[in-house]
């Protein structure tokens, strides 16, 4: 008798870019896995909106149940599902320096740092991955060089960032990204993460797991770019999820070229 499938939920901001990219990721890497079932659900709001809903209930309400209240699309997809049905919860959101959806009493506080500390375990409240400045940053990656085309951008440029990709990129159509492109994205993002924390030696998998987690990356973003130049180091964290999820064997495949 076959074992029960492990249910995994991907939660993300919108139904456009994020949905297409993560649906492709699920198809490329998880569709052939008999023991894992992926459910994609948009929050139809940014990470601060989600955090605000959870904060009101002192984080006693599961993020899956809050999602049903926030998004009609998610509510429909989660029909008949309970929060306890999901073994793992992953959240993929954009960096949003404006904090437009934070109550006044929390303005000026490091809310994103608090959220990364709260959402740091996929088997509990969920594990949060932040892309800087947004998921569209994957279009910065050049497959041939396996690197990002730009290092940073000004915080003032974030609002127009997604409209800056007029020319064709290697990741122009999310639904057509193949495994080789994803491997290149993983290589580019692990190199960029290492650069962000100013690590000059060869980045091993052990170093990556223990030193390039989402909380550490944000601390370096905040200290070296955001608060020291009004900048963001461009980094897409979706490929970092793949490196963490599929562990060292996958890391070796990515870094073999």
Show where each model-derived region lies.
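Short acidic, Gly/Ser-rich segments with clustered Asp/Glu that frequently serve as metal-coordination loops
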Residues: 14-19
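A charged nuclease-like catalytic/ligand-binding cleft shared by nucleic-acid processing domains
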Residues: 44
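C-terminal accessory helical subdomains adjacent to catalytic cores in phosphodiester-
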Residues: 2-5, 20-40, 48-60, 69-257
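Ligand-binding clamshell of periplasmic/extracellular solute-binding protein-like
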Residues: 66
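Conserved beta-strand elements of the Class I
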Residues: 9-11
